[in-house]
């Protein structure tokens, strides 16, 4: 498709094509532009505060594009499409002698029609502009307010304590090598191989080979070690490292590359001990917060895929170097890296353009496991270091889902198990030892706090727990970084350091669950305006109502709808797999991923995010994808196992299944329109079910519709919650 790109006009709102409920850009965006060290007559100088980053860019560049090029992480949920309003900035006014700049509102182009519409609808205070719409006309200082900065998210993905049988693919072998003899003409490498075969017969499994750098260093290393050396033998036949004398420790790294966060666990390849764990935001987030925004960025910006690949490789290098420093090692001690990630991350990691994943049939370039040199990816570790990437299952069910399956092993259990990795794109596996099915469900970023008016990532100041009194509708809550609840002594003083900044993803699940249990929202998701008689926290919000948790944190009707849409997509996904399996119930539920770790299973079930089952059979498994990566790092048999298992998993494409939409509509109700959630009701006191007379009521925008008959469906009341 040929796409025009205006050079000096604000980008028009992009036309959108819907693929499996994802929005994919096929309309115009701004040019790819680079920052220059020397300023030309057509360039402007831009300085960002508080980061202090600055550079020269061509006039007509948008502020957001300049920020991306300079590495300033301005929040942009929609990927620069003028849809979210998260990328607000303020142009500095006055003379900035330090930078040699006189900055003002006229340093940016005129306010666009898109900004005017946004300001009329949601407001732009204090001279703020949308950075994705603001064109640079002159030298300028740009202030990025805290709410527009990508928060320093808490990456809570610690390694679990599961026991892993050690059978690493790389092993250390100390060998004594015969010195050269004038009467026996043999090369040093041949004698090294002979010594290795003789002294380590249980570890040598084939004809020994080596990398070129080993041949180049074998003679000086043998002599430095006085004919005693340690070699690292990979897969029983390939020498990838050699050191003089005794080398006691080498390391490997298991890395889970998520679309939002990345986590790494550095392990001792001899003992299996976790030496260090590090985590960070995925630096690709500046190109778009959800996966399809990044695919779109690559489509609309020539070389955008390479730009995103470079960003994530740089992020991986930072993680590895940080973990090595924590462990008291160097990058050269790292000989093995195992990676897992969703299909888009998987492709970008390998330098593969993910454009084909942007539309049906969502074709993968490769679905088998991949094994390459670390140097081929530009990762700086030991010269013999290798990277192993777990296989993808299909389409939008990636290597991270394979890692979850490896760690949780539903294929080894006779019980029917649902494994779900909740994220921007939920990956779902249902099955047991007889059969397994997998699907992806486009839940969107609402579960991570995006699309929520007070939503944010899990950072200090974010509400993560809440309880609402059913009689007074008064909330009590906890925020990340503060030990006390809001009604406890010392909270007000402790929270001053961070403030109450918003609601994180796991927190919004609990907030809506409590609002439903307290009667603030009805079964069809409407914020009940009649409850305003009970509490001033419920106020009119245009034609709907909202609930105030604190002075600056509010839950609106649109927030409720965003979660309804996300949870309905999740329910429809696993229900579709249950239909294919011809089963009516799930025996156990495994919530994978860092987000799943922090969801209270009760509230996930109250909202209908997971199927009805005994609450004690719902388990938060933590970062199972990372655990699977660690298993593949420390046990080569685990690699063979998952490679075989994924071939037997049946992939169901939700986009072409007629029943998906029917399940989706019914799942919009809380917890569900037709499923009574009887097991949950036996443990949690649920509100009285009020059903409409129609089989499939329209649920739009939270507006009450006239002429709808409502019937009451009593439900057995359990003990007090």
Annotate each predicted stretch with a short phrase:
Residues 283-325, 451, 460-469, 562-565, ...:
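N-terminal phosphate-binding loop and adjacent alpha-helix
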Residues 379, 392-407, 564-568, 618-655:
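Glycine-rich phosphate-binding/hydrolytic loop that grips phosphoryl groups
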Residues 516-571, 575-581:
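A contiguous, well-structured pocket-lining segment that forms one wall/lid of small-molecule binding clefts
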């Amino acid at each position: 498709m040929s796409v025009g790109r205006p050079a000096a006009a604000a980008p028009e709102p992009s036309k959108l094509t819907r693929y499996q409920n994802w929005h994919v850009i096929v309309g115009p965006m701004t040019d790819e532009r680079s920052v220059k060290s020397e300023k030309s007559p057509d360039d402007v100088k831009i300085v960002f505060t508080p980061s202090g980053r600055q550079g020269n860019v061509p006039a007509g560049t948008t502020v957001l594009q300049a920020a991306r090029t300079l590495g300033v992480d301005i929040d942009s949920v929609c990927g620069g499409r003028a849809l979210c309003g998260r990328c607000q900035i303020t142009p500095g006014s006055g003379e900035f002698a330090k930078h040699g700049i006189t900055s003002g509102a006229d340093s940016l182009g005129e306010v666009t029609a898109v900004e005017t519409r946004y300001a009329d609808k949601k407001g732009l205070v204090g001279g703020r502009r949308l950075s994705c719409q603001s064109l640079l006309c002159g030298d300028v200082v740009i202030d990025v307010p805290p709410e527009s900065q990508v928060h320093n998210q808490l990456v809570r993905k610690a390694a679990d304590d599961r026991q892993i049988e050690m059978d690493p693919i790389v092993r250390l072998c100390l060998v004594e090598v015969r010195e050269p003899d004038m009467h026996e003409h043999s090369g040093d490498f041949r004698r090294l191989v002979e010594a290795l075969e003789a002294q380590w017969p249980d570890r040598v499994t084939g004809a020994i080979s080596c990398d070129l750098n080993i041949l180049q260093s074998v003679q000086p290393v043998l002599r430095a070690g006085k004919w005693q050396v340690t070699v690292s033998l990979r897969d029983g036949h390939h020498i990838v490292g050699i050191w003089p004398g005794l080398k006691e420790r080498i390391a490997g790294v298991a890395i889970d590359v998520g679309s939002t966060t990345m986590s790494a666990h550095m392990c001792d390849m001899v003992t299996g001990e976790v030496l260090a764990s590090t985590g960070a935001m995925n630096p690709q987030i500046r190109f778009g917060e959800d996966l399809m925004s990044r695919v779109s960025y690559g489509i609309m910006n020539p070389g955008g895929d390479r730009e995103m690949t470079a960003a994530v490789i740089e992020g991986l290098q930072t993680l590895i170097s940080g973990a090595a420093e924590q462990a008291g090692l160097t990058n050269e001690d790292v000989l093995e890296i195992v990676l897992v990630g969703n299909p888009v991350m998987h492709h970008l990691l390998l330098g593969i353009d993910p454009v084909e994943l942007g539309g049906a049939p969502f074709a993968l370039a490769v679905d088998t496991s991949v094994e390459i040199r670390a140097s081929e990816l530009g990762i700086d570790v030991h010269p013999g270091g290798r990277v192993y990437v777990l296989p993808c299952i299909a389409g939008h069910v990636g290597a991270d889902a394979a890692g979850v399956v490896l760690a949780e092993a539903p294929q080894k259990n006779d019980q029917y198990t649902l494994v779900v990795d909740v994220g921007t794109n939920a990956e779902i596996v249902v099955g047991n030892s007889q059969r397994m099915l997998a699907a992806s469900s486009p839940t969107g970023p609402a579960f991570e706090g995006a699309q929520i008016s007070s939503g944010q990532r899990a950072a200090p100041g974010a509400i993560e727990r809440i309880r609402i009194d059913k009689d007074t509708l008064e909330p009590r809550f906890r925020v990340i970084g503060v030990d006390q609840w809001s009604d406890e002594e010392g909270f007000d003083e402790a929270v001053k350091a961070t403030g109450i900044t918003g609601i994180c993803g796991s927190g919004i699940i609990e907030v809506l669950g409590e609002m439903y249990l307290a009667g603030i929202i009805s079964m069809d998701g409407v914020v009940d305006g009649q409850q305003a008689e009970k509490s001033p926290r419920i106020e009119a919000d245009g034609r709907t109502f909202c609930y105030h948790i604190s002075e600056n944190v509010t839950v609106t009707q649109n927030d409720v709808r965003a979660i309804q849409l996300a949870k309905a997509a999740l329910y429809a996904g696993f229900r579709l797999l249950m239909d294919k399996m011809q089963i009516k119930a799930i025996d156990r539920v495994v919530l994978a991923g860092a987000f799943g770790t922090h969801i209270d299973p009760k509230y996930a079930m109250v909202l209908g995010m997971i199927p009805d089952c005994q609450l004690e059979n719902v388990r938060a498994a933590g970062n199972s994808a990372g655990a699977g990566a660690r298993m593949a790092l420390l046990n080569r048999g685990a690699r063979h196992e998952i490679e075989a298992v994924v071939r037997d998993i049946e992939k169901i494409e939700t986009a072409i299944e007629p029943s998906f939409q029917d399940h989706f509509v019914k799942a919009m109700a809380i917890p569900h329109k037709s499923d009574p959630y009887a097991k949950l009701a036996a443990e949690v006191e649920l509100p009285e079910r009020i059903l409409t007379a129609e089989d499939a009521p329209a649920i739009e925008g939270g507006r009450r519709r006239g002429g709808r008959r409502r019937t009451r469906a009593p439900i057995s009341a359990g003990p007090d919650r």
